Structures are given as structure tokens and as C-alpha cells.
Amino acid sequence: MLKSTPVKEALAGTAPRDVILVQGWVRTRRDAKTFSFLELNDGSCLKSLQVIADAALPNYADIQRLNTGASVAIRGKLVASQGQGQKWEVKAETVDVIGAADATYPLQKKGHTPEFLREIAHLRPRSNLFGCVFRVRSRLAYAIHQFFQERGFVYVHTPIVTGSDCEGAGELFRVTTLDLQNPPKREDGAIDYAKDFFARPTYLTVSGQLEAEAFACALSKVYTFGPTFRAENSNTSRHASEFWMIEPEMAFCDLQGNMDLAEEFVKHLIRDVRTHCAEDLELFAKFVDKELLSRLDFVLDRPFQRVSYTEAVELLTKSGHKFEYPVAYGTNLQSEHERYLTEQHFKCPVTVYNYPKEIKPFYMRLNDDDRTVTAMDVLVPGIGEIIGGSQREERLDVLQKNMERHQLDPKDYGWYLDLRRYGTVPHSGFGLGFERMLMFVTGVANIRDVVPFARTPGNAAF
């Protein structure tokens, strides 16, 4: 049985082939007097393969009825193309129509807005733009695993259902099998979660960090890469309710080592995509963001500037720039502040470190000044924050005080405190939002357009 050849492989051929089988979807059909041109795409690459179907073919009448979107299997010869724009084309000997597409097929040969394509998310991967997005997404995921595996990290699967809130933000999706119309109650009238499936309140995870810390304190270097969930009612272009996170954790690692790895990681991902997704990136640079390639190279070519939070606030305050949100010590930097630092002041990526303890989670290591913690955020041009991390608090007594300050019950984190009781060790880690990185390397401005089926407030279609 003849094996099908991907379009990408056929186009990259170095010699003609007497027999080839290609399968895919018709992008366009053009009829001449004695033959038809078919543009065939199978998603393996951006370009389509031109097929010449002669009028002498026994089912030529069926071929002339092929609409955009129809699926076909074509057997023929791979020959040098007589036309411009492609090196090879297929001279068809048989054209089998696998699945017809009627005239209502919404992806006709014209431009479509991202807003329209979000409404047909089940079909939009067939468009040029979204085919590119999801090929880059696939390659980026591969590059992530490659980076950590080559450096001796162990890949850990952390739980999706959890009883802890790593960030302490309270923006959690609850998981329950209780009857919502008539839940069991305790004597005080509160819902009795002891009768729930897990016999306690449980949620979809917001982070795998705490569990990853447990494994780092045994395997030294680990990373997680999986879905996370936030019930944050933010209907913006940067927020989604379901997204993927990469979270490495390293034992015997301080803030300096953490910042070094984060910078190396970001550059590796950009370099890999620039090397392996050149054709797709060219489309983004042409139609999405004309500054994309220069911005990616800009990040690759420069060391990241490092500045303390205190210094960053002073720079922003003295800049004279009018911000929508005022700059003040003790508040989180807004996206406009982050972009000012990277795009106008330093003109390069920036790592901000040592934040006030009041605005960071309980697990971050307290500095000797008793005012700041060893937090760090990596900021890049065009996006702002792309990585957030810290050295973790390894001292049991200090961690317990941090939990009290954040009004967390130590009983809920007994296992986490055990990591400090039994062979504690300095350790660090960070989180990179996968979709945010994908937005950065493609120039796509809305997170809904880099997720296969976006989950946002008020929307869980498909």
C-alpha cells in the first residue's frame, strides 16, 4: 500500500517521483479548458501543493464540482512545476473525493477577522493564520521539553484537582459532586464538604508549584508543564480561565541562579522557533506584526537588564512620563510600567527583583531587610511580564510567620511545612505562561487566538 506523503515533504523534495500519494483539503480550484488546478493543503506547512487534474480523468466532472474545504486523496507524479511560486507540483492520475464541502463552508478565499474566526474555532485551524499559530504552539511545547531534558530536569505531572491555593488569590474553580440544588449541611448551616467526593473542598489547580517543590527536594531539578485554571473575571486580551504553565523548581538554587535560568530559557525558546518555524513567522511578520522579527532578534541579542523593584519605581517616578496608573512603592507594576522600562528606558528585556513582601505570596523568601522578598519578574518588550518567580522560603519558622501574615491555616499546608522540617534546602523556581510566550513569539495580540478552544468569562463553547 502506498504511503501518503505530507505536503511539506513533497514541496521539499530534491527529485521528481514517479508515484506519490498526497491527501488533504482543497484550498482553491481553478478550471482551464482541458484541466483544473487544485491547491492542496494538509496542515503540515503553510504552503499548498499545486495539483494538475486533466480533463481526461474519468471523474473529472466530480473534480470540477470540488469546493474549497473538500477533502481528497490524489495519486500521481511529482514533477517540476512549470509555473512560478512553487518548485514541484503533482500531475494527478487519480483524484478520490473523500468528503465534499458545500457552498456554506465559511472559510472561503477571502480575509476573515479574528473575531469571526473565534466563532468557528472548530474550523479556524484550516486558515493560514491559525495553521501557523498552532504549528508554532506545537514546536514551542517541544522546545520547552527539550530545554529542560537537556539540562537534567525531571518532568513531573502535578495534580489538576487540588486542595490548596498556591497563589492565595482565592480565584478558584471548585470541584464537587454534591447536589447543588440540595447540598448536605452541617449543624451550623454551612455546606458539609466531608460528604463530597474527596471529603474536603477541592479546586482546579492554579499552579503546580507547591507539589513541584516537593519533587525538587528529592530529585533536585524538576519542571511541570500543564493546564492551570483561574476563575478571574477579567475579560481582557491577556487573560484566559484555562491556560498552560511551565514551572521549573531547582534545589540548591538561589535568586541569582533562578534569574540566570529564566533568561536562558526565554532565549532558547525564541531561538528554537526562529530556526524551526521560519515560514510561519514570516506570515506573522507580514500580516500580524511588522516589527515581530526585529523584536525577537532584539531580545536574543542583548543580555537582560536587572534592576530591583525599588530602583524600578524610582526610575518610573522620575521619568516624567504620564501613566494611566500612578507609580507608587508598595503596588504592583502595571503593564504600561513594565513596557516603559523595556521599550523606552532600558530598551531591552528587564528582570525586576526584590519586591515588597506585602504584594507577594507567602512562599517567597524574606530578605534580610525584612521588607522585601526574593521575587523576580522577567519583562519583555511588547508584552510586559512574561515570567514570575522567586527563591522559596526554606526556613520553617519564617515560613510559618509568613503564613500567619497571609492569614493561612498551617494545618492546610502540613505537608508543605514538612519539606522544611526534613532536610530543608534553598530552592527556587518560576512560572512561564505558555500562551503569553506564544503571543510574544507570534505577535498575536489576543490570548483567545493562541488557544485551540479558549475558555474565558461567559464562554466555554466547543
Regions found by a protein language model. Give the residues of each.
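Class II aminoacyl-tRNA synthetase-like tRNA-binding/catalytic domains
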Residues: L2-E247, A251
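Generic non-transmembrane alpha-helical segments
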Residues: A143-R151, F265-H276
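A translation/RNA-centric and nucleic-acid-associated enzymatic feature enriched
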Residues: V161, E171-R271, E282-F462
